[in-house]
A protein has these predicted regions:
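N-terminal positively charged helical leader segments and presequences
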Residues: 1-103
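Amphipathic alpha-helical repeat scaffolds
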Residues: 25, 120-128, 240-246
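Structured adenosyl-cofactor binding patch, chiefly the S-adenosyl-L-methionine
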Residues: 30, 35, 131-134, 151-162, ...
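RNA substrate-binding interface of SAM-dependent RNA methyltransferases
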Residues: 38, 55, 105-196
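Short, ordered loop/turn segments at secondary-structure junctions
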Residues: 48, 72-74, 144-147, 215
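Short beta->alpha connector loops at strand-helix junctions that form conserved
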Residues: 71, 117, 143-144, 172, ...
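Active-site/ligand-binding-proximal alpha/beta "capping" segment
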Residues: 187-238, 242
Length: 259
C-alpha cells in the first residue's frame, strides 16, 4: 500500500512576512502619510485624535485600507508602548539601505551629513534624526558596527517624523567609506575633548559629521579616517552632552556662518 505523504512535506518553510513597523505619535504618523503613504497598512487612533485622523482615514478609505478608533488600552497593546501619542499607523517596515557605489547624490544635498558609528540606543538614533532633519540634513549613514541601532519603532517615535524626511544608508565598512568620501566631504569626528571648536572648521565643502558610540565614542579605526575633530566647550561641571543633544548643537554651529 503506497504511503500517504502530506502535501508540502519536505519543502523548505516559506519565509515569514516581516512584522509591520508601528509608527506612533501625531508628527511621525503625519510624516509617514506625507512621505510614504503607500506603505501604510492600517491606522488606529483615540477619539481625541479624530481631527488628526480624519483626513488620513479618508485617504485610507479611498485606497481600501483599514482604520479604526480604539480605546487607550487597546492602542497601548497595538503600539507596544504607552507612549503612543494617541495615534498609531502600522506600515511596511523600512530598513537602512546598503550604501551604493558610487555614493548617491542625496548624500551631497545637505551641508552636514550625520554618520553614526555604533550609536546603540534607538531613542538616540531617532533624536539625532529629529535634530538633523530640523537643520536640513537629507541623509544619514549608519555604521557596520554590530552595536549600531537600525530603524525601529522606538527610533521612529523619537524622531517625530524626522526619519521620514531622510535617506538612511548602512555602510558595509565605515572606514573604507569615509576614505572614499574624504575628497568630497570634510570628514569630522565629534569628540568629548581635544577637538577644535566647530566655528574653526574650514567651510569649502560639506561636512561628514561622525558621531560615536554613547560610551566609547568613535572607534580608533574610524577616528583615523577623520581629517578633523571638533569638541563643544562646556562649563566642565559634566563631561559631555547626550549624543543627540550634542548633534543638534553641532549642526546648528556648523550650518551657521563661519565666525
Amino acid at each position: 500500500m503506497p504511503s500517504q505523504i502530506p502535501e508540502g512535506w519536505g519543502e523548505a518553510p516559506r519565509p515569514r512576512r516581516p512584522e509591520p513597523a508601528r509608527i506612533c505619535g501625531v508628527n511621525a504618523v503625519r510624516a509617514l502619510f506625507l512621505r510614504r503613504p503607500e506603505a501604510v497598512i492600517r491606522l488606529h487612533y483615540l477619539a481625541e485624535r479624530r481631527p488628526v485622523a480624519g483626513p488620513l482615514c479618508r485617504y485610507l478609505a479611498r485606497h481600501h485600507k483599514a482604520y479604526r478608533e480604539v480605546l487607550d488600552d487597546e492602542l497601548t497593546r497595538i503600539a507596544g508602548t504607552e507612549h503612543h501619542g494617541g495615534i498609531v499607523a502600522l506600515a511596511e517596515p523600512r530598513r537602512a539601505l546598503p550604501m551604493p557605489n558610487p555614493p548617491p547624490p542625496i548624500l551631497f544635498a545637505g551641508s552636514v551629513l550625520p554618520v553614526l558609528d555604533g550609536i546603540g540606543n534607538p531613542h538616540n538614533l531617532g533624536a539625532i534624526a529629529r535634530g538633523a532633519a530640523f537643520f536640513g540634513a537629507k541623509a544619514m549613514i549608519l555604521s557596520d558596527d554590530p552595536r549600531q541601532a537600525d530603524l525601529s519603532d522606538a527610533a521612529y517615535r523619537t524622531s517625530e517624523g524626522g526619519l521620514e524626511h531622510m535617506a538612511v544608508f548602512r555602510a558595509e565598512h565605515l572606514p573604507s567609506l569615509l576614505r572614499r568620501l574624504s575628497g568630497q566631504f570634510l570628514v569630522t569626528a565629534a569628540v568629548a575633548a581635544g577637538g577644535q571648536p566647530p566655528h574653526a572648521l574650514p567651510r569649502g565643502k560639506p561636512i561628514a559629521l561622525v558621531l560615536g558610540n554613547e560610551e566609547s565614542g568613535p572607534s580608533p579605526e574610524v577616528l583615523a579616517c577623520c581629517e578633523a575633530r571638533i569638541t563643544l566647550a562646556g562649563s566642565g561641571l559634566v563631561e559631555s552632552l547626550n549624543v543627540a543633544a550634542a548633534t543638534a548643537v553641532l549642526m546648528h554651529a556648523l550650518m551657521g556662518p563661519k565666525a
